[in-house]
Amino acid sequence: MSARQHTPDLRADGFTFKRFFIAHDRCAMKVGTDGILLGAWAPLRHESRILDVGCGSALISLMLAQRCEGRVPVDAVELDIAASVQAAENVAASPWRDTVVVHQADIVEFSCTTPHRYSLVVSNPPYFAAGVACASPQRTQARYTSSLSHEALLHSVSAVLMPEGRFCVVLPSQIVGDFLFLAESLQWHLALRVDVADNPRRPVHRVLLALTQAPIDPVYSSALLIRDELQQYSPDYRALTQDFYLSM
């Protein structure tokens, strides 16, 4: 059966998209807007190979595989054993089982051993400094930078990114300034930025960034509303995600 003919069954133990299903009951971080935003937005050019750092359930990896029509290899790296097993199962049940490969590995070690170089790297990374413990060690690992500092992440991506490649992340708005300051100190350059708000009455709460290792001029900035004044999905959000949500 081809990717275009594949229609996922509706199930209650995960999230059903138009062309694949994501089970996430063994993953610390469930399917959410952050991952969907990054997977739908990350700019695609003439990609040769893609890396998803901290892939969790493989949501972003499969979204990118769909957008590339299975023509671009995707390596999905996940440290947590249970999540990596479930990610591999999600990939195996998808139309892109021959395109996406899940690696249970630490990205710092992976970046030192992989023979591949990537034209696009994406990550929905841990974002908070160590604080109140979460309900499980797995969720603490997924949310807090004690498991992977932003500096270590930036160094690891730098080691595997092609000179003309891009590194795309989604981050909470309150830490973007510190992240960009750190990135610039490590010779990264901002290429694209999208400030995301839930609706016109709410402040920006998430930011999508594309970074490069070569200066980009000009830097493009824009804004995205998820919902409009009537709490309906905005036209821009619909256009971004309509290939994935069943309801669009």
Swiss-Prot record:
Question: Which GO cellular component terms, listed alphabetically, does the Swiss-Prot or TrEMBL entry include?
Answer: cytoplasm
Q: Biological process GO annotation list?
A: methylation; tRNA processing
Concerning SUPFAM superfamilies, the annotation shows: S-adenosyl-L-methionine-dependent methyltransferases
Keyword S-adenosyl-L-methionine listed? The answer is yes
Which keywords, in A-to-Z order, does the entry hold? Answer: Cytoplasm, Methyltransferase, S-adenosyl-L-methionine, Transferase, tRNA processing
Entry's EC annotation: 2.1.1.223
Which EC class is this protein assigned? Answer: transferase
Domain of life, per the record? Answer: Bacteria
Please tell me where this protein is predominantly located.
Answer: cytoplasm
Subcellular localization is given as: Cytoplasm
What is any Pfam family matched here?
A: MTS
**A Gene Ontology molecular function term of the record:** nucleic acid binding
Catalytic activities: adenosine(37) in tRNA1(Val) + S-adenosyl-L-methionine = N(6)-methyladenosine(37) in tRNA1(Val) + S-adenosyl-L-homocysteine + H(+)
Q: What does this protein do?
A: Specifically methylates the adenine in position 37 of tRNA(1)(Val) (anticodon cmo5UAC).
Q: Which family does it belong to?
A: Belongs to the methyltransferase superfamily. tRNA (adenine-N(6)-)-methyltransferase family.
Question: What name does the UniProt record give this protein?
Answer: tRNA1(Val) (adenine(37)-N6)-methyltransferase
